[in-house]
């Protein structure tokens, strides 16, 4: 399989690294797309072999495959900026259910604690 098919593919795609990337992409497309009629005829071969054979036979459009690969690698999720202030106000309203937290200045939980002063000496807090 590999040597003869790869040598045939080198006539169409001379760079072996590029060939590997494009053949891998086409093999993945064969796995995920519905091409069961053609794959049933070539059932004994796996998708990578089928993709190499189709590339060697010229049945695959290499520029189209390259464009498909580039499109698959692009990130399609871009952050959209807020258009108006009403949307940001809606976010603030969603957090109204949170309870308010009171932070007091009562240090009673620190009673009976041992602290170190600036001189490095231990001292206990007095009430």
From Swiss-Prot:
EC number: 2.7.7.6
InterPro entries: DNA-dir_RNA_pol_omega, Pol_omega/Rpo6/RPB6, RPB6/omega-like_sf
Protein's name in the database: DNA-directed RNA polymerase subunit omega
Subunit structure: The RNAP catalytic core consists of 2 alpha, 1 beta, 1 beta' and 1 omega subunit. When a sigma factor is associated with the core the holoenzyme is formed, which can initiate transcription.
Entry's family note: Belongs to the RNA polymerase subunit omega family.
NCBIfam families for the chain: rpoZ (TIGR00690)
Function, as annotated: Promotes RNA polymerase assembly. Latches the N- and C-terminal regions of the beta' subunit thereby facilitating its interaction with the beta and alpha subunits.
Signal peptide: none
CC annotations in GO: DNA-directed RNA polymerase complex
GO biological processes: DNA-templated transcription
Cited SUPFAM superfamilies: RPB6/omega subunit-like (SSF63562)
Catalytic activities: RNA(n) + a ribonucleoside 5'-triphosphate = RNA(n+1) + diphosphate
UniProtKB keywords: DNA-directed RNA polymerase, Nucleotidyltransferase, Transcription, Transferase
GO MF assignments: DNA binding; DNA-directed RNA polymerase activity
Alphabetical list of Pfam families matching this protein: RNA_pol_Rpb6
């Amino acid at each position: 399989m590999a040597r003869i098919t790869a040598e045939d593919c080198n006539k169409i795609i001379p760079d072996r690294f590029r060939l590997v990337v494009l053949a891998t992409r086409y093999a993945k497309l064969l796995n995920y797309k519905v091409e069961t009629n053609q794959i049933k005829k070539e059932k004994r071969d796996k998708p990578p072999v089928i993709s190499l054979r189709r590339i060697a036979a010229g049945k695959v459009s290499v520029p189209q495959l390259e464009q498909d690969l580039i499109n698959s690698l692009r990130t399609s999720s871009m952050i959209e900026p807020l258009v108006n202030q009403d949307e940001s106000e809606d976010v603030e309203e969603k957090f109204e259910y949170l309870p308010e937290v009171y932070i007091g200045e009562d240090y009673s939980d620190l009673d009976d604690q041992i602290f170190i002063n600036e001189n490095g000496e231990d001292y206990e807090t007095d009430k």
